[in-house]
Each structure stands twice: as structure tokens, then as C-alpha cells.
């Protein structure tokens, strides 16, 4: 059952607005009431523009398609921009959320995306082509995606680092 959910969760599509969508996880949840159980679904999705834009959303509903649509809409509303350099990150960064930690390292061209599960979905829709990642601690999809986004928001361009240090970009790059 888990393998079927995983394959279904990897379904990706591109809409007419040019954004890439990927479903990360679908959970079946139950609420126990006096009359029995009430089934529901929770969906976790990521949306990206293929050029450093990324958004994460979660949706809940009694039916899977409605939950997925809610998650996609939330992901579109919460999109943020990350600066990339030749299809990879500017520098090594660690992202944390709860018990999940994600180590992300830039990689030379041709390496590909070396990342597992939820992290891979984030990088594919975001437009990253070369990266090396390791998930440490919790492997809960929601926490891993949040940790990945927290790490990506901490990426600085050489211009931002130079401005913080009061130096020129040439001094930073060496």
C-alpha cells in the first residue's frame, strides 16, 4: 500500500500558467465519532516555476482531488524566490524544522539531483539540476519539505554577503 501511494505521490504535471506541480504525500486520516469513523485526506504538494521559485501547500478534505487542489492553491499563494547559480545552490546550507535537518550542498554540472523523496520533489519543480542532499533526523515529509525551504531561504548571493560585510563582490569571490 505504501509503495502505491509513493508512486501516485510522484505524479507531476504542468498547468497552463507555466508552473510545475508535484504531489509529495497523501495521508488518509480518520476521526472517530460516536457513530463510527469519518475518513478524510491530507495532501502535501510543492509548486515551482523551474527558475528558483518554490511554494509548499497542504490541503485537507473528505476527497483526495479536493485536498490536492487546496494544497496546490496554497502552494501558489506561498511561492518564494531562491537565487540559483548554474542550476545549483550558491553555497552549502543546512535547513531545520522540528526534528528534521536537511544538508544541501552545491554540485558540479552533470551530477544530477542526489536527494531522497520529498527533497527531490522540491528541487525538481524549483529547477535545480545539480545538488547533493542528506536528510538527518525525522523523515516526516512535511517536516523535511519545511526544513528544505527553511534552508533555501537562508541561501545568500555573493552580492548580499558583500553588502553585509561591507566589502566588494570581488573580495568575497576571491
UniProtKB/Swiss-Prot annotation:
A GO cellular component entry from the record: small ribosomal subunit
Gene Ontology MF, one: structural constituent of ribosome
UniProt entry tagged with the keyword tRNA-binding: no
BP terms from Gene Ontology: translation
One Pfam assignment: Ribosomal_S5
Keyword RNA-binding attributed: yes
Keywords recorded for this protein, A-Z: Ribonucleoprotein, Ribosomal protein, RNA-binding, rRNA-binding
Domain of life per record: Bacteria
Transmembrane segments: none
SUPFAM superfamilies, sorted: dsRNA-binding domain-like, Ribosomal protein S5 domain 2-like
S5 DRBM domain: residues covered: 19-82
HAMAP family membership: Ribosomal_uS5_B
Domain notes from UniProt: The N-terminal domain interacts with the head of the 30S subunit; the C-terminal domain interacts with the body and contacts protein S4. The interaction surface between S4 and S5 is involved in control of translational fidelity.
Family named by the database record: Belongs to the universal ribosomal protein uS5 family.
Function field: With S4 and S12 plays an important role in translational accuracy. Located at the back of the 30S subunit body where it stabilizes the conformation of the head with respect to the body.
Subunit architecture: Part of the 30S ribosomal subunit. Contacts proteins S4 and S8.
Protein name (record): Small ribosomal subunit protein uS5
Organism whose genome encodes this protein: Azoarcus sp. (strain BH72)
Lineage: Bacteria, Pseudomonadati, Pseudomonadota, Betaproteobacteria, Rhodocyclales
